[in-house]
Amino acid sequence: MSSLSLYTVQAVLILDQQGERIYAKYYQPPHRSDEGHQLLFNSVKKQKEFEKQLYRKTHKQDSEILIFEDHLVLYKEYIDITIYLVASLEENEIVLQQGFSAIRGALDLILNSGMDKKNIQENYDMVLLAIDETIDNGVILETDSNTIASRVSKPPTNEPQMALDLDKGFLGAWGFAKSKFQERLQQGL
């Protein structure tokens, strides 16, 4: 058994139908000095080359998991995008699958009109938040897609929303004062 670590994910990628990057986030654990990982993922040119080769390998395949260039890759193809989760070969496939399913499920809930390139680009901020809620610096934090989607889509409820309608308040006070004044006048007569 290799070293145990919470840092399981090396990258999360979303590529379009030409293999071009829509979203890419590479993680590097702070305590590991893995030279191969650093050389592969430190330059944008090498990252894009890796993504192109990965897309060519996985495009129109019937599997959901494969070993590619000493990396374990989980992926899912949709209409015009493919989502990838990249990890080292030593990682637990079941944990990775749960994290990957959480990302996919949360994105399905957030992007209720469909998982396609246009919808992802229109809701890019929500996609980023969902991935960041699931994986932080390579550590899978949450595996429940409903929890992730609720954290991303709900506005914060810390402060109560108080809408002051000054016209209504002023008119209400004026009406109250007017009625009290009329009562006093009637009592005085």
UniProtKB/Swiss-Prot annotation:
Localization of this protein: Cytoplasm; Golgi apparatus membrane; Cytoplasmic vesicle, COPI-coated vesicle membrane
Example GO BP: retrograde vesicle-mediated transport, Golgi to endoplasmic reticulum
Membrane-protein topology: Peripheral membrane protein
Pfam families per the UniProt record, alphabetical: Clat_adaptor_s (PF01217)
A Gene Ontology cellular-component term: Golgi membrane
Primary residence: cytoplasm
Keywords for this protein: Cytoplasm, Cytoplasmic vesicle, ER-Golgi transport, Golgi apparatus, Membrane, Protein transport, Transport
Similarity comment text for this entry: Belongs to the adaptor complexes small subunit family.
Protein name, per record: Coatomer subunit zeta
Organism: Saccharomyces cerevisiae (strain ATCC 204508 / S288c) (Baker's yeast)
Encoding gene (name): RET3
